[in-house]
């Protein structure tokens, strides 16, 4: 099917640090990204003390928009939204910049209020991020920071604060010195900005905290590169601050996983985030799946926010790769029953059980490529697909489980993922393998009543009397599975 211009949508965000363009098309109630262009314009750096935007900064912005304009020519105007944020809200001569910007792009540019920006960010998060739906969303931009609480699709409080990674860089790291004093000043200033809104945020409360900005993205990249789990904590932020202080100067800042492009505004963003964690007593934060641009796009498409984003993602993937959903359900029921039977001994957390059920939903997707090496194909697809609702570490765990669903077990891959502890990954893998094995006849009426018990790492399977005698192929498969598990010292006893 040819993609026509009318099925395309574009969202452009003229931020204080970067200009971004996102071009998508709608597919099965979700969006498929076709183009993402990002240019570091650092508009906020061109803002003088009396809030005049310098000609040089304006020219950098216009130059970037000329690139964007070429891509917009094929998209209907009513399917394009261009918004400008903090710096253009502040600049007294923003009218001059916007007039030329509209001429270049051939469509209107809307300067949105801080509250509207916060609302759109929240919508972008609600459409793309899994987990508990009572959340606090934090987005540190170039010149403003948005803090939003909400439940499901509904924001309950919206705040846009005048601090950002570019303005804090210019204000507190002017000498490009990464000294403790600079960090202290930057953090204290951020705390002052936060104090007036803290009580209101706490009043609404949240169960999970998600970050939706370049600073949080950079932290995620650092943690993945260093083999840590993906949860951002105050201890990790303090550790990274000490590393930055050791580097001494901004131009010498070297942290494994931190790209050169993000390095310039990383210390200032880090200082703001440390202040937010300390003042709001945040225990842990994860990266959001989308923010402002996604909020704009979903708004144009008028798509309702699904309560369970992961379920929507799994359904879309199953449809796309022609997965036998009845078989996936059968395997999921068995895996769920096994997990419940081991509730007291292995005590899998709800999130771990969810990820096990997600692996069951996708375990046969590799068959759409070829039966041979189907688990390898499935793992590759999961690693490389965009899966809204799943974090990068969760995707890696799913891929690892799918890779190890049959035949030999690659223990090192289960230990290299960092979504769950290695021992939990082993437990999930064992339950998935057994569920697949016992559902192999692909019929509900042939699922045996299996009793599963665990003592430490030793698993005991109790089958109905005469089951092994009446099912020679099944007995052979269980014997083979016993061998595979014993190779990695997983004790499996069959009664």
Curated annotation (Swiss-Prot):
Gene3D superfamilies hit by this protein: 3.30.420.40, Exopolyphosphatase. Domain 2, Hypothetical protein af1432
Pathways per UniProt: Purine metabolism; ppGpp biosynthesis; ppGpp from GTP: step 2/2
Catalytic activity: guanosine 3'-diphosphate 5'-triphosphate + H2O = guanosine 3',5'-bis(diphosphate) + phosphate + H(+)
One MF annotation (Gene Ontology) recorded for this entry: guanosine-5'-triphosphate,3'-diphosphate diphosphatase activity
Disulphides: none
Family note: Belongs to the GppA/Ppx family. GppA subfamily.
HAMAP family (alphabetical): GppA
Protein name, UniProt field: Guanosine-5'-triphosphate,3'-diphosphate pyrophosphatase
Organism annotation: Enterobacter sp. (strain 638)
Gene: gppA
């Amino acid at each position: 099917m040819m993609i026509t211009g009318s099925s395309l949508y574009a969202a452009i965000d003229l931020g204080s640090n970067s200009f971004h363009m996102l071009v998508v098309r709608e597919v099965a109630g979700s969006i498929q990204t076709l183009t993402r262009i990002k240019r570091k314009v650092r508009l906020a750096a061109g803002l003088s003390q009396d809030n005049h935007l310098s000609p040089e900064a304006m020219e950098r912005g216009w130059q970037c928009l000329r690139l964007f304009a070429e891509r917009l020519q094929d998209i209907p105007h009513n399917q394009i939204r261009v918004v400008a944020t903090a710096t253009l809200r502040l600049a007294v001569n923003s009218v001059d910049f916007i007039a030329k910007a509209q001429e270049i792009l051939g469509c209107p540019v809307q300067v949105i209020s801080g509250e509207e920006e916060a609302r759109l960010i929240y919508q972008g998060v609600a459409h793309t991020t899994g987990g508990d739906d009572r959340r606090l969303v934090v987005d540190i931009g170039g010149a403003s920071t948005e803090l939003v609480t909400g439940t499901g699709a509904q924001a309950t409080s919206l705040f846009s604060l005048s601090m950002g990674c570019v303005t804090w860089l210019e204000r507190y790291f002017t000498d490009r010195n990464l000294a403790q004093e600079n960090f202290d000043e930057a953090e204290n200033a951020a705390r002052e900005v936060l104090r007036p809104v803290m009580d209101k945020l706490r009043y609404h409360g949240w169960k999970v905290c998600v970050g939706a900005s370049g600073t949080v993205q950079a932290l995620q990249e650092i943690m993945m590169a260093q083999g840590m789990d993906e949860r951002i904590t105050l201890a990790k932020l303090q550790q990274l601050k000490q590393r930055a202080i050791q580097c001494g100067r901004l131009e010498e800042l070297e942290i494994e996983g931190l790209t050169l492009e993000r390095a310039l505004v990383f210390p200032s963003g880090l200082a703001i985030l440390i202040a937010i964690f300390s003042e709001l007593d945040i225990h842990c934060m994860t990266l959001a799946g989308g923010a402002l641009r996604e909020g704009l796009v979903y708004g144009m498409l008028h798509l309702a926010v699904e309560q369970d984003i992961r379920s929507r993602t799994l359904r879309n993937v199953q449809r796309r790769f022609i997965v036998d959903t009845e078989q996936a359900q059968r395997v999921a029921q068995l895996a769920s029953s096994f997990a419940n039977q081991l509730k007291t001994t292995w005590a899998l957390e709800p999130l771990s059980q969810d990820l096990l059920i997600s692996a069951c939903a996708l375990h046969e997707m590799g068959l759409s490529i070829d039966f041979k090496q189907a688990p390898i194909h499935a793992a590759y697809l999961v690693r490389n697909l965009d899966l809204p609702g799943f974090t990068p570490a969760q995707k890696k765990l799913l891929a690892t489980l799918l890779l190890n669903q049959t035949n030999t077990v690659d223990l090192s891959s289960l230990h290299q993922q960092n979504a769950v502890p290695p021992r939990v990954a082993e437990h999930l893998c064992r339950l998935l393998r057994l569920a697949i094995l016992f559902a192999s006849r692909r019929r509900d009426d042939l699922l045996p009543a299996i009793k599963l018990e665990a003592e430490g790492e030793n698993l005991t399977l109790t089958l109905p009397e005469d089951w092994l005698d009446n099912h020679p192929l099944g007995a052979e498969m269980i014997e083979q599975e016993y061998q595979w598990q014993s190779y990695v010292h997983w004790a499996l006893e069959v009664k």
